[in-house]
From Swiss-Prot:
Interacts with MinD and FtsZ. Belongs to the MinC family. The lineage of its organism: Bacteria, Pseudomonadati, Pseudomonadota, Gammaproteobacteria, Alteromonadales. This is Probable septum site-determining protein MinC. NCBIfam families: minC (TIGR01222). Keywords: Cell cycle, Cell division, Septation. GO terms for biological process: cell morphogenesis; division septum assembly; regulation of cell division; regulation of cell septum assembly. Cell division inhibitor that blocks the formation of polar Z ring septums. Rapidly oscillates between the poles of the cell to destabilize FtsZ filaments that have formed before they mature into polar Z rings. Prevents FtsZ polymerization. It comes from Shewanella sp. (strain ANA-3).
């Protein structure tokens, strides 16, 4: 029996949500450009859902926002939290209207493997622990990236980027002896350096998800 020419299957993906809190596109783009400069590769080509719940202006220039994001190689795939007028505007632009769904109560499968490295990870290097945790006995330098489908443990300074729960595991954590990261991310929720500095003093800590927000906890001495 020949295979059908197409199949329609259900699947779930982790998407970043861009919250727009101002109708002033110049101000929005100036702030976005500042964030992109801190982690350009992380956002490059990233599909975004735009949350417009803070925008009540029905004349908001959604087309202009879409074009400005495209010029920065960011792609709007849909909007959420919009007024009826803005939702209609989105439909004419070919954007999906996304409704926030309830989180699944079924926990993801536990990582099956652990990748252990006894070395420093230098600028330009990338390490990925697929289907498991990543343990590094060393430092992660500026410009380096460490990624794991499970948790990340760094017995040294974290100065680069660390992305745990890359496959969507919201129970993953990032632990480091010194939190000085350019970017940290768990299951798609991320902090840039400026966010991390507000919650940490370059000391050891454990970053995890609390609902849909990242938090950092001190490690016992």
């Amino acid at each position: 029996m020949s295979k059908p020419s197409l199949e329609l299957k259900g699947a779930s993906f982790t998407l970043s949500v861009l919250h727009i809190n101002s109708s002033d596109l110049n101000a929005v783009m100036a702030e976005l450009d500042s964030k992109l400069a801190q982690a350009p590769q992380f956002f490059l080509g990233a599909p975004l859902v735009v949350n417009l719940s803070a925008i009540q202006d029905n004349d908001f220039n959604l087309h202009g926002l879409k074009e400005l994001l495209l010029s920065r190689q960011l792609v709007i795939v849909g909007i959420t939290g919009a007024t009826t007028a803005l939702s209609n505007q989105a439909k004419t632009l070919g954007l999906a209207i996304v409704k926030a769904g309830k989180q699944s109560v079924t926990p993801p499968p536990a990582p099956r493997q652990t990748k252990v490295l006894k070395q420093n990870i230098r600028s330009g290097q990338q390490v990925y622990a697929k289907n498991g945790d990543l343990i590094i006995f060393g430092a992660v330098g500026n410009g380096a990236e460490v990624i794991a489908d499970g948790s990340i443990h760094i017995y040294g300074a974290l100065r680069g980027k660390a992305m745990a729960g890359a496959a969507g595991d919201s129970s993953a954590v990032i632990i480091a002896h010194s939190l000085e990261a350019e970017l940290v991310s768990i299951a798609g929720q991320y902090w840039l350096a400026e966010n991390l500095q507000q919650h940490s003093s370059d000391k050891s800590g454990c970053i995890r998800l609390n609902g849909e927000s990242l938090i950092v906890e001190s490690l016992p001495l």
